[in-house]
Swiss-Prot record:
It holds the Pfam family Lyase_aromatic. This is Phenylalanine ammonia-lyase. Belongs to the PAL/histidase family. One of its GO terms (biological process) is aromatic amino acid metabolic process. It is an enzyme of class 4 (lyase). It is found in: Cytoplasm. GO terms for molecular function: phenylalanine ammonia-lyase activity. Optimum pH is 7.7-8.5. Pathway: Phenylpropanoid metabolism; trans-cinnamate biosynthesis; trans-cinnamate from L-phenylalanine: step 1/1. (E)-cinnamate binds at residues 223, 311, 317, 347, 419, 448, 451. Keywords: Cytoplasm, Lyase, Phenylalanine catabolism, Phenylpropanoid metabolism. Its EC number is 4.3.1.24. It comes from Nostoc punctiforme (strain ATCC 29133 / PCC 73102).
Length: 569
């Protein structure tokens, strides 16, 4: 397989065609969706079932009845008997109430840029259905059921990456989903189980008629944070996978550098008991346990080695203190995104019990904008930390005697080892750090006739986080390649052969062997991963590893124990 094909595979891993996974069912409407459930529906085709709770169904119908009565009695309600946004002073008659909703789709059909991944759109659809089942939106059950049908049949509307400022929700992106659901016009297109077609044809194949929106329904569908939150949910999941892999990379790097295990002694971290620091230290303690490639100093003694430092440099010694805040931050981000996932985010909201509606602002995606800004910042920190470890590995004066640039066959004088690979990584790390800059504070105050004069930029922030995650996967591939080569060379320096499996800790052997299998490296004691520069294509190896990570393959499975532990923090 050539490099182009491998890169296309990476792209397709986020454009996952519908694959029906009937092993489980995700029930929507009980207000307890998790990120894992969103990912299972979005990427793996897990079937969706709307709750059959009678109270929920009655609430949905009661909210519709309230809206219909309000229209009949000409009650002043935003977006139902009034115009939108800065034109909310326009009075809408009973005869125009339904047309207003359809017209909302048309004037919002203004997206630009590339299409979102199918997985991110599917996540958005799931969350929109979940929000509407609260019974505060004034939308028919039939329309919510249509979302369920689309998800279970693998019909995914095409949505564009630009168009939402995250203020009145994701108006423009959701207009594409709504237009496709009701079959408004052939210009709305979908992916139908891997095939592109217009939404009208898709409805026909599903045996569904076109739908005419009723009062409030267009606004209910388009006025909410579901798209940005769906993207965010997928990104949080991916970031946790990458954080687990980061721990594995550091464990390989520490063993490659012949670092000490003393830095992770429980006593140190009990003296500064931040939850994330404790978790990180405990995980690294476990990852390094029984390794022959670390200095065994858990007894508190310090091995003095002449000209070498008596203690490790900060990137090793302070690892738990550096990554700990990120672990705590990701845990908080997870909680906030899951609250947003299980919220009602349109406007106005209907209190059916008290027969009153309220004008509010739950559509503002500030929680998503701020959390995604934070997540990108954390990714930048993780990448910079790994970059420092790589710099130590390639420099003999800092690596405890490994060859320069981790050259495999030093007898072949033209070999430059992983010099080019480091440069490639150096080109990625600054970009990830740059992407860590915030967007939520860069909003236009004049948006939509100064009506949306504060806005979250949550949608763009979530999309940029998706980009950051994708790039970090490539960087992680590079880091893993360095880790494998380093432990091979360290094994040779200490044992006279290159089979690192005999020296690595039991908890890192699986990651090592997974990387070797993905890139096609023979497990041998005769040669390290990279022997001569001209015997492999490093770009193909980057692509193979990146694709494996994106698809949740062998490499991700090798750190499942870390990932599972991380999810419980």
């Amino acid at each position: 397989m050539n490099i182009t094909s491998l890169q296309q595979n990476i792209t397709r891993s986020w454009q996952i065609p519908f694959t029906n996974s009937s092993d489980s069912i995700v029930t929507v409407g009980d207000r307890n969706l998790t990120i894992d459930e969103v990912v299972n529906v979005a990427r793996h085709g897990t079937q969706v079932r709307l709750t059959d709770n009678a109270d929920v169904i009655r609430g949905v119908q009661a909210s519709c009845d309230y809206i219909n009565n309000a229209v009949e009695t000409a009650q002043p309600i935003y977006g139902v008997t009034s115009g939108f946004g800065g034109m909310a002073d326009v009075v809408i008659s009973r005869e125009q109430a339904a047309e207003l909703q359809t017209n909302l789709i048309w004037f919002l059909k203004s997206g630009a840029g590339n299409k979102l991944s199918l997985a991110d759109v599917r996540a958005a659809m799931l969350l929109r259905a979940n929000s509407h089942l609260y019974g505060a939106s004034g939308i028919r059950l039939e329309l919510i059921q249509r979302i369920e049908t689309f998800l279970n049949a693998g019909v995914t509307p095409h949505v564009y990456e630009f168009g939402s400022i995250g203020a009145s929700g994701d108006l423009v992106p959701l207009s594409y989903i709504t237009g496709a659901l009701i079959g408004l016009d052939p210009s709305f297109t979908v992916d139908f189980d891997g095939k592109e077609m217009d939404a009208v044809t898709a409805l026909s194949r599903l045996g569904l008629p076109k739908l005419q929106l009723q009062p409030k329904e267009g606004l209910a569908m388009m006025n909410g944070t579901s798209v940005m939150t769906g993207i965010a949910a997928n990104c949080v999941y991916d970031a946790k996978v990458l954080l687990a892999l980061t721990m594995g990379v550091h464990a390989l790097a520490i063993q490659g550098l012949y670092g000490t295990n003393q830095s992770f002694h429980p006593f140190i971290h009990q003296c500064k008991p931040h939850p994330g620091q404790l978790w990180t230290a405990d995980q690294m303690f476990s990852l390094l346990k029984d390794s022959s490639l670390v200095r065994e100093e858990l007894d508190g003694k310090h091995e003095y080695r002449g000209k070498d430092l008596i203690q490790d440099r900060y990137s090793l010694r302070c690892l738990a203190q550096f990554i700990g805040p990120i672990v705590d931050g990701v845990s908080e981000i997870t909680k906030q995104i899951e609250v947003e996932m299980n919220s009602v985010t349109d406007n106005p909201l209907i209190d059916v019990e008290n027969q009153v509606s309220y004008h509010g602002g739950n559509f503002l995606g500030q929680y998503v904008g701020v959390t995604m800004d934070r997540l990108r910042y954390y990714i930048g920190l993780l990448a910079k930390h790994i970059d420092v470890q790589i710099a130590l590995l390639v420099s003999p004066e800092f690596s405890n005697g490994l060859p320069p640039s981790l050259v495999g066959n030093s007898d072949r004088k033209v070999n430059m080892g992983l010099k080019g690979l480091q440069i490639s990584g150096n080109s990625i790390m600054p970009l990830l750090s740059f992407y860590g800059n915030s967007l939520a504070d860069r909003f236009p105050t004049h948006a939509e006739q100064f009506n949306q004069n504060i806005n979250s930029q949550g949608y763009i922030s979530a999309n940029l986080t998706r980009r950051s995650v994708d790039i970090f996967q490539n960087y992680m591939a590079i880091a893993l390649m360095f880790g494998v080569q380093a432990v091979d060379l360290r094994t040779y320096k200490m044992k006279g052969h290159y089979d690192a499996r005999t020296c690595l800790s039991p908890n890192t052997v699986q990651l090592y062997t997974a990387v070797c299998e993905v890139v096609g490296k023979p497990l041998t004691s005769v040669r390290p991963y990279i022997w001569n520069d001209n015997e492999q294509c490093l770009d193909e190896h980057i692509a193979r590893i990146s694709a494996d990570i994106a698809g949740g393959g062998l490499i991700v499975q090798a750190v499942e124990h870390i990932f599972s532990s991380l999810k419980s923090t």
